[in-house]
């Protein structure tokens, strides 16, 4: 349950995202996916950011706690971060409208990534202020994805 405007919202909208730090060398991404596969954990959404020395894989997995433990046990540097997922129509301007709602209320997007499936676009957002972000999205009737929905994508 999550509190928005002092009311309990019945679907937990904050999801756990894994951030895995990878050396820039051949095979490291393969190793991550093999560890997850061995544990039966599905990697359903991801993005990779990199610099000269390392990359960061940010991903949504089917079982975050299990994945975290497996990756730690295999000597990966991994963190868990709270994110929120939304679903919007996969048409021009749809995301711009949602981002305008947030920026007008002072919510800064630290990063985001998305994936589309037919007529629907799903967006993972890491805001600077989770409570305010969820409040704004709820008030504007944006379709928030429950964590359990994200883990099944």
Q: Where are the regions a protein language model picked out?
A:
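A conserved regulatory-domain signal marking ACT and ACT-like small-molecule sensing domains
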Residues: 4-153
């Amino acid at each position: 349950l999550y509190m928005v405007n002092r009311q309990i919202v019945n679907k937990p909208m904050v999801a756990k995202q894994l951030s895995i730090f990878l050396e820039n060398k051949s095979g490291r991404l393969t190793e991550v996916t093999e560890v997850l596969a061995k544990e039966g954990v599905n990697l359903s959404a991801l993005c990779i950011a990199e610099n000269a020395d390392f990359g960061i894989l940010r991903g949504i997995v089917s079982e975050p706690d299990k994945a975290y433990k497996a990756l730690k046990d295999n000597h990966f540097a991994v963190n868990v971060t709270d994110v929120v997922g939304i679903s919007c129509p996969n048409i021009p301007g749809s995301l711009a409208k949602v981002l305008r709602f947030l920026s007008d209320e002072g919510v800064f997007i630290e990063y985001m990534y998305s994936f589309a499936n037919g007529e629907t676009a799903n967006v993972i957002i890491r805001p600077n202020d989770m409570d305010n972000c969820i409040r704004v999205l709820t008030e504007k009737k944006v379709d928030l994805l429950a964590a359990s929905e994200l883990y099944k994508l």
